[in-house]
Amino acid sequence: MLNVFGVSASMPDDSRSQKMGLLGAISYIVGNIVGSGIFITPTSIIENVNSVGLSLAIWILAAFISMLGSFCYVELGTSIRLSGGDFAYLCFMKWYPVAFAFMCIGCTINYPATLAVQAQTFAEYVFRGAGVELDETSEFWAKKLLGFSLIILLMFMNFFSLKTFVQRFSILASLAKIAATLLIIITGFYYLIFKHWKQNLEEPFKGSNWNPGPFVNALFAGLFSYDGWDILNFGAEEIENPKRTMPLSIIIGMTCIGVIYVAVNVAYSIVLSPTEMIASNAVAIDFANKTLGAAAFVVPVMVAILLIGSLNSTMFSASRYLQAVSRQGHIPSAISGIAPNCDSPRVALLVHILIAIAVSFLGDPDKLINYVAFAQWSQRAFTMSALLYLRIRGRPRHPDRIQLPIIMPILFFLVCTSMVVISIIDDFKSSAVGLGILLGGLIIFIIFVWDRALPSSHTFRNATHVINEESTKFMQIIFNVVPERVGDEEMKNAIGGAESESEKVPAYKISPTGNGQFKCTRM
């Protein structure tokens, strides 16, 4: 039977000399956030708000919301020392039905849709950069196949954890990210200062659309580009003097990112009119074609490289999330399998890729971003309610925590809730996908996981146990992996309790018999 288990709370206790200082924490935040979003969402934002001025205001507002969220999640992460983010905190609160429902959204929408958006954008930049022109149907399938080919290639690379290659490529992707953003900013401001291209900035708020629905959709798109602001939440104990370093690094890091994003969008707006941006499928390419002449090919090449890096990062995070969910007993333990020779969650990788390929057919990148944003911010509203519950009721938390003025989590909770409610009222079709999966997750939990429903049946427990063990053995043979599971007692570590070792689900040793077959022995 699939049970609800606790999550791992292990964090390395590094020496002071190995810990991250202020500069390291700032670079960690900036490096994790600045990426593909700035080349994906500008068109969506200006399409929703219809003006340069309001689109820039959206970028600034998204930076402030992300900064506020980052502070709140730092308090949460230092109060409850669990890996696994929102899902782990909801489990800690014993809100298992809610945690399970949002886990379903995370596995089927959040990560897969993000991967699909990045793959589709990669294909768009490659096709536009290469000047390939096909009829509409052929172009649709050609772009899909190119995106799928890339993520399948990256999947096999992650199967064998080619760390040396991945690390080197990550450096290349980081350089491409820096070069592309600097090139766009410098070029745009060159045309403003020396060529006097000011026409698009003269009436920045002309024609602005202030309707709540489009405004929230634009804000969702902006926040998608700032995604990753909770990164320090996963490594509070890795930071030197966290009570000083973490707040300063958030303020400085998020301010730097906000300045970079606004500068890039000002550069776009100097060169391209709102009409041109709305009509663009690859805004950086149209920018380059209008300003760089024969050197315009450099931009799509750099964007394609950084998108590959972003795809690999998303795939890495998503597969570990799926594997962690399996370790906790929410989904079959076969998915928790880790390759013993390279620590790769191969089954989780494959499952994630298959879901991402299916999700990519749900709509264009803008539609997928709305699905992701609604699901994410719904979950964050529940997570903030958990933090407020802990604060107001005075429940046990880790003694060495960072505690904010309570007005900050209250304000962030209101922001999350407001965006979700407005999205439901004004764009119910986009919200319906997330709401449907959320409701489906609750129904599945009540029927198949809740111990007063089917799991109370001895026959059901035996059947699910047999299916779980047989599927685990099958996946071990196919992928050469060993499944894992964590124990409930590890929850004690979350608030500074005693440590306990991870338990493992039944594992099997696979050995050849010499006649072309294999023997499976329970360990």
From Swiss-Prot:
One BP annotation, GO: L-amino acid transport
InterPro entries membership: AA/rel_permease1, AminoAcid_Transporter
Gene3D superfamilies xref list: Amino acid/polyamine transporter I (1.20.1740.10)
Sugar attachment sites: 289, 462
Gene: aat-6
Tissue: Expressed at the apical cell membrane of intestinal cells.
Membrane-spanning ranges: 20-40, 52-72, 87-107, 146-166, 174-194, 215-235, 250-270, 291-311, 349-369, 405-425, 430-450
Cytoplasmic compartment residues: 1-19, 73-86, 167-173, 236-249, 312-348, 426-429
Molecular function via GO: L-amino acid transmembrane transporter activity; PDZ domain binding
Keyword annotations: Amino-acid transport, Cell membrane, Glycoprotein, Membrane, Transmembrane, Transmembrane helix, Transport
Pfam families noted in UniProt: AA_permease_2
Membrane topology according to the record: Multi-pass membrane protein
Recorded superkingdom: Eukaryota
Official protein name in the record: Amino acid transporter protein 6
Any one of the GO CC terms: apical plasma membrane
Family, similarity comment: Belongs to the amino acid-polyamine-organocation (APC) superfamily.
Function (record text): Amino acid transporter that mediates the uptake of the L-enantiomers of various amino acids, including L-glutamate. May play a role in promoting fertility.
Extracellular side: 41-51, 108-145, 195-214, 271-290, 370-404, 451-523
